[in-house]
């Protein structure tokens, strides 16, 4: 978590609005205290916070495609509206640029919130955050992991990010993907993270075991390369290593933007 308390004070001092992107942790962070975990203030209790975004389709367990944004005042909310008073079809007013939205998504969201309820979200927080802490502890204490992997920052909620001290972290990501664990690659610095979900709470020990196996395998590959006098240059790279390795080495990120645009163009081809 970012230090929202400090950012709030800064926003007040500079007389600027402060938006809190709480899309990922919105149904976990408010439950941390009731679940018995360490927490930090992040919401409208901080005077500098003017708006908060919250994804109901993530840890809110609602259908994909809906999200919410909260404003401190109704006056601030009006800036998201789109109003066209001189349209030929009459006055057009919409809550946002997106225009028409399916009512089924709202109904599905409401049903999810009512079914799970506050107690259900607190229980999910206990399981999810508790599992994240188990994964952190395993990485920091495992004989095969503690000397090779390093936890990034201080995970307070569900996301555990880590990097490798001697190995290529993206090779580890590709090897984990081959075992069915699709972890998210990060850059600046190179790292990967796992966002713990309810299904992972039931198999987290298997994830750690597979991670131990992968690290041992990558360490052995590196040892063989060194014995044979081969460096990392010229070795076969997996998808993550190739993509993030190249992206991280390019001083001009406009090339990366062009590559991403080309990828998106392909998605539109019939």
Language-model segments: which ranges?
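Residue-level "edge-of-site" marker
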Residues: 24, 156, 189
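Short loop/turn segments at secondary-structure transitions that flank enzyme active sites
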Residues: 26, 75-77, 200
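Non-catalytic terminal extensions of PLP-dependent enzymes
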Residues: 122, 131, 141, 146, ...
């Amino acid at each position: 978590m970012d230090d929202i308390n400090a950012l709030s004070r800064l926003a007040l001092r500079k007389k600027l609005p402060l938006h809190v992107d709480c899309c990922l942790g919105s149904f976990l962070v408010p439950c941390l205290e009731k679940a018995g975990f360490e927490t930090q203030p992040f919401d409208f209790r901080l005077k500098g916070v003017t708006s908060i975004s919250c994804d109901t389709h993530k840890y809110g367990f609602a259908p994909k495609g809906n999200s919410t944004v909260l404003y401190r005042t109704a006056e601030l909310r009006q800036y998201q509206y789109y109003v066209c008073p001189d349209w030929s079809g009459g006055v057009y007013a919409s809550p946002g640029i997106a225009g028409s939205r399916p009512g089924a998504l709202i109904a599905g969201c409401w049903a999810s919130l009512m079914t799970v309820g506050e107690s259900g979200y607190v229980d999910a927080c206990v399981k999810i955050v508790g599992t994240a802490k188990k994964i952190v502890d395993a990485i920091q204490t495992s004989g095969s992991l503690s000397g090779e992997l390093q936890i990034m920052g201080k995970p307070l909620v569900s996301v555990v990010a880590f990097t490798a001290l001697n190995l290529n972290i993206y090779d580890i990501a590709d090897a984990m993907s081959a075992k069915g664990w699709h972890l998210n690659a990060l850059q600046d610095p190179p790292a990967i993270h796992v966002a713990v979900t309810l299904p992972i709470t039931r198999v987290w020990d298997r994830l750690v075991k597979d991670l131990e196996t992968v690290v041992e395998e990558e360490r052995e590959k590196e040892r063989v390369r060194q014995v044979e006098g081969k460096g990392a240059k010229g070795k076969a790279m997996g998808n993550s290593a190739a993509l993030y390795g190249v992206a991280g080495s390019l001083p001009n990120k406009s090339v990366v933007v062009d590559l991403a645009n080309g990828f998106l163009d392909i998605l539109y081809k019939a």
